[in-house]
Amino acid sequence: MKSVFLSPNTLTMSRIILTVIFIFVMLADGFIFKFLGAAIFFLASFTDWYDGYIAKKHKMVSDFGKLMDPIADKFLMLSAFLVFVKMGIVPVLAFLVIFGREVFITFMRLYAKNKGQILSAEKFGKYKTVSQVFCVGSILIYTVLRSADTTNSWSDVTISRWQEYIDFCIMVAVLMTLGSGISYYFNNKNVFRLQ
């Protein structure tokens, strides 16, 4: 008998709960909160991989999981970017591009499903996900290191270089997100044709 604690659906729901906790913890001031926030995000990201692994290995794939897993993934990633907007790290426009792409692609998939069609994921989309995770991870590392510097020992050059690196990560994530969304639309636009 499989343990309920290893249920993919349980892990998916735990990811949603962890995301809510992540939001409040990251918005609090202090090194300990930034460190815990980063740890929670990486733990939530791990559950994303682990629930898929368990579902396939133990043949526990369910309709609930198919619906909620991508929703939990998007909730985690969009929440992270929104938190960074609140912290003044990510521009609002960058967040809107990422948010808009995810909402539009989700709408396309639901619309297609309603018509009895299944729109499969593209490799471009996987690259988009990698760029977003790398971007969020980099920002989390930066915020943890900055919050640990209670003596303000970072030089202006160090801060400037970190900011340039973070800006580059954001730019790549936005371009990959926008590009994957455009690619997905043109490769699946037939779903909008009237029959």
Predicted feature locations:
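Alpha-helical transmembrane bundles and membrane-interface segments of multipass inner-membrane proteins
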Residues: 1-195
